[in-house]
Amino acid sequence: MHLTPREQEKLLIVVAADLARRRKDRGIRLNHPEAVAYITAEILEGAREGRTVTDLMAYGTTLLTYDDVMEGVPEMIRAVQVEATFPDGTKLVSVHDPIRRRLP
């Protein structure tokens, strides 16, 4: 099997996101690379499902909270930008301040 560099990068994101998802499910707080991979993979899948850029920008802010990540991680991730493949082409999805405090 031959994968292009872009396909290799996407595969690496999916593997890292899977690890992050399993850790999150076990109650282990995510570090910086895990949090970015988790958010990125969800955005990529949403794009493949046909969701809109605007919808994914909002969705990206609901995936993780301060309780899901290690101390200091939210301050390190001010934005996540994902070049995602939509049914009508490739578009850039920017999620600003993706990790937010849980609402009461």
Swiss-Prot record:
Its EC number is 3.5.1.5. Pathway: Nitrogen metabolism; urea degradation; CO(2) and NH(3) from urea (urease route): step 1/1. InterPro entries: Urease_gamma (IPR012010), Urease_gamma/gamma-beta_su (IPR002026), Urease_gamma_sf (IPR036463), Urease_subunit (IPR050069). It is an enzyme of class 3 (hydrolase). Keywords: Cytoplasm, Hydrolase. GO terms for molecular function: nickel cation binding; urease activity. One of its GO terms (biological process) is urea catabolic process. It catalyses: urea + 2 H2O + H(+) = hydrogencarbonate + 2 NH4(+). This is Urease subunit gamma. The lineage of its organism: Bacteria, Bacillati, Actinomycetota, Actinomycetes, Actinomycetales.
